[in-house]
Each structure stands twice: as structure tokens, then as C-alpha cells.
């Protein structure tokens, strides 16, 4: 396997296959599954390894987003472009999020994964989902919008809220651009600061196999592979639908915009394996942003589209929400009228916005949706509680591919896509190690 550094004059370095990160993560996942299966108690005890890695990644997310967005916007000569990029991104997010919801609903009608279970809602354990429902009730649309505005300029960096960091970064970047040449020393400082920050990302990623091992060992050790058997139809249908969405829907979008979805998936395979191991798409956020810039998307587009997409472009979560809601209705023998399903769709469109890219967020979002739609019992969520963790991986994987696709598409719409860089990246082995944010590959086009 050859690793290519695209910076000028950089030597070509060869790596043995076992030194490549995605191979290490894949091996770690397999070992974690085996440990959790054969030694469940020991597997459960590995949970701190996964949690620790997630905390390490979250530690660096805020500075990565702030520096990428701020320097990207500050470099823009046309400030109207910021609003234009954001507007195009939101249109893309709305269209494909809605399409994902509809596809989940249509497939559920065709396959009927919950039919024949004949569950009495009164017999379900409502206490098991009470915590999720409480969190869902606390999450209103108004509260979500107000929460984007931080208490202070520094509080987002303490709390790690992605949208708050993005909000501050956009405002600060606009301020730098409006001040003009006088702000150039600050912009230069941020560009220089980006180098050690992205080098730190590369250092932290060395711990990815340990995190993936711990998270997977815990998942299998606690929930067991057998817990998935009883609800295999739902889980299998969800996985198949997600693959269908990526290959067919996103595949058509990719082909129309001049690239291959299969090559894109291959290009971000390290990030996908990281997400698979941790069930959190946030774990791959820093390296995904870096890779999308290497693939020819300008820094300004990546800085706006990727972090925003983590709250507004969750294709996997959207498929899951309508599919899970209809599964519960079918299992409880509750017929849904056309009006009920339209209401479910509309509520899901709203409640899915702002769902965080962390484990369990999709379940909380589902609780928020069902608590507004009276026809489907919230207590029915107890039916899928045991296998939600297994569906969480697929949700996160689909979300990640969706956001990578969105970055390229919006960059192309905006004329900010280096097609040569995209071709080189997607036809390489995906191992592009340079983390220097001042290199040509990382600048706006």
C-alpha cells in the first residue's frame, strides 16, 4: 500500500498493511466482538476505552471547526457567498432528509417488519424508555434555536456544542473579512495554529483501534449477539434500506455530479470503520473535514456544510425514525391513516433537525416524534430498545456518507470544487497523511 503526500516535493512513503489505520481499526473491531461474545463480563469492562476515545475526539472538535470555518470565511472576498453556500446546503439537506424519511416509510409498508407480533401496548415496560421521553420533551424547536446562541463567546468551547461553535466561528470569520487587511495578522495566526491542531488530530487517531475495540467489546458483551435475533426483521430491513439509499439515491446524486459513490465510500473508509466501532459519527468529524478538503472541496464550503450537516443532514437517522415508528404501529396492531402518516412525516422532519451525531441521539429524537404523534404509543419504543444500539452503527454510517456527498455537491454547485483534486483523491488509496492546513490542497479554490 502506498501513501502519497501531495505537498510539493514530498517523498512517497510506503506503509505495510498492518500500519494502515483502517486495517488496525478493523482488526480491533473483530477482536472486540470476539471478546464480548466469549467473555461478556470482561467485554463490558472495556467500556472506558471506547468512552475515553470519544472524549479525546470531542476535545479537538471545537478548535477544528472554529479554525476551519473562521479562516475559510475570512479568505472570502465576497461575503454574500457565505449566505449563498449556507442556503444551498440547507436546500440540499431539506430535500434529502425528507426523501430519507419517505423511503423509510415506504419500505416499512412494503416489508411490514412489525406485522404479526400482536403486542399489547399496555404490557410494555414504559419505565425503560422514560428517560428518553423526558429528554425529548425538554427538546423543543424554540429551545433548539435559542440554544444555538451561546451564553458567552467562550462557552461553546467548554461545552463542545457543535452548532454553537459554528455560530461563533461564522460571526468571527465574517468580522475578520469585514475588517479587511488590518485583520490579516489574526487570520495568519489562525492559519498557523491550524497546523498543530490538525497534527494533534493525527496523533489522537492513533488511539482509534483502542477506542473501537473497547466500544465493540462493550456492545457485544452487554447486549449480546442473540438480542438482535428477535428483531432481526426490523434490523435487517433498516440495514438493507440504508444500503439502498446510499447506493441508489446518493449514487445517482454522485453520478450526476461527476463522481462515484463507491469510490467516495472507499476514500472515507477509515472514518466509516471508526464510526462502526464507536457508533458515533462525531468521532470521524475532524478527519472527515480534512479529507473533504483534500478531495477538492474548498475550506469555506467544508467548514459550513460538514458541521451543519451533523445536525441537519442525518439521512440514516431519518430512515430509522419513520421505519421504527411504523414498526411499533404494526407490532401493536395500530392502523395509521394517511393523515396520521403525513403528521408523522412532518413532525419527524422538524424533530430530526438538531439530533446530535452521538450514540443514542436517534432514539431520543424518535421519542420526541412519537410524543407529538398521539396514534403511536411512546411505550412501544421498549420493543426496539434492546436492538437500538445495533441500528445506531448503521445510522451513523449513513449519516457520514450523506454529509461527505453533500460537501462535494454543494462545492460543485458553488464552483468551489477542484475536480482534479477530487479525481486524484477518489482514485488514490485514501491514505493522504499531510495535515498542513497551509498546503495548497487545504486552501480555498
From Swiss-Prot:
Its main location: membrane. Disulfide bonds: none annotated. The chain crosses the membrane at residues 17-37, 56-76, 91-111, 157-177, 200-220, 233-253, 319-339, 367-387. It is a multi-pass membrane protein. GO terms for molecular function: fumarate transmembrane transporter activity; malate:proton symporter activity; succinate transmembrane transporter activity. GO terms for cellular component: plasma membrane. This is C4-dicarboxylate transport protein. The lineage of its organism: Bacteria, Pseudomonadati, Pseudomonadota, Betaproteobacteria, Burkholderiales.
